[in-house]
Amino acid sequence: ITYYCENRDPDFDQKMHNVLLVYKQLSLQFDENGQFIPFSEDEQVVHVLSYDEKPGIQAIATTSEDLQPGNNHKTISRDYEYKRLGTVSLLAGIDLQTGEAIPLVKDSHNSKDYIEFLKKLDDKYPKADKIRLVLDNLKVHSSEQTRKYLATVPGRFEFVFTPKHGSWLNLIEGFFSKLTRQMLKGIRVKTKDELVQRIYKYFDEVNED
């Protein structure tokens, strides 16, 4: 038996078209040298971000010290036993015009946390500008609590939703994959707060490059 993923989104093609149109419009904002072309004075500035959550990042501690490479082993050796310290959720967006990665690390990823991220974006960009997000259809993205917040900032945000089973259309997925390979895989910490700080440090280093 082989498995496949049934397309259960009747609007899959239209939603995919909408996402790809955002990317096409974005590509036209860069010249042949890859330099961003500023908006004209009579245009509304639109900031385009790819957004997603990465929940369940485990804070894991070792129960004994790692053994450094020596005569008997050529790699770092680690005890099989470990201690779980809890999990955190990463809410993040990538500004597709500047390349800046914007993180928020929380204990959960509910409507309150999502709204906190939106407020972070609202504080970051000039008030006259529009913020366009490419994101999935997670319930918190359109919850009653989220809608109430959005009603307080009319016209500020625009959402372009990926189709169900279309996460591959969201560019931040590639960033999360890189984050896992480079930093989260095999990470050990002494406290959950240390994990949070190391995630933020990773983003700082990415944004410095």
For each feature predicted by the language model, list its residue ranges.
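Electropositive, glycine- and tryptophan-enriched low-complexity nucleic-acid-binding patches
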Residues: 70-129
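RNase H-like polynucleotidyl transferase catalytic core
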Residues: 77-82, 151-171, 187-189
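RNase H-like two-metal-ion nuclease catalytic core shared by retroviral integrases
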Residues: 136-137, 160-181, 193
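Acidic, metal-coordinating catalytic cores used for nucleic-acid/nucleotide bond scission
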Residues: 109-110, 133-145, 164-169
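Residues immediately flanking
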Residues: 51-53, 96, 137, 164
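Charge-mixed, compositionally biased segments that are often intrinsically disordered regulatory tracts
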Residues: 1-84
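Acidic beta-strand-to-loop metal/phosphate-binding motif
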Residues: 50, 128-137
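C-terminal anion-handling pockets and recognition modules
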Residues: 173-209
